[in-house]
């Protein structure tokens, strides 16, 4: 059985730092992303750069990610 790594964040926008983090986390196990919702990003940044569904689609299609959950 593989280890499970749970990461959370806004990923708005997705950038190379996220890619490096996912590559490093993949050495530990399979990755599940808890993706911050648009309301959280609005409180933090004023408004999201990309919608939750856009961010979830991008992050969910990354090589090491097995699931994306709303947070």
Predicted regions and their residues:
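Nucleotidyltransferase catalytic core that binds NTPs
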Residues: 1-71
């Amino acid at each position: 059985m593989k280890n499970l790594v749970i990461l959370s964040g806004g990923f708005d926008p997705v950038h190379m730092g996220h890619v490096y983090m996912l590559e490093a986390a993949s050495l530990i196990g399979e990755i599940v992303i808890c993706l911050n919702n648009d309301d959280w990003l609005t409180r933090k940044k004023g408004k999201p750069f990309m919608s939750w569904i856009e961010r979830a689609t991008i992050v969910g299609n990354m090589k090491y990610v097995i699931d994306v959950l709303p947070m």
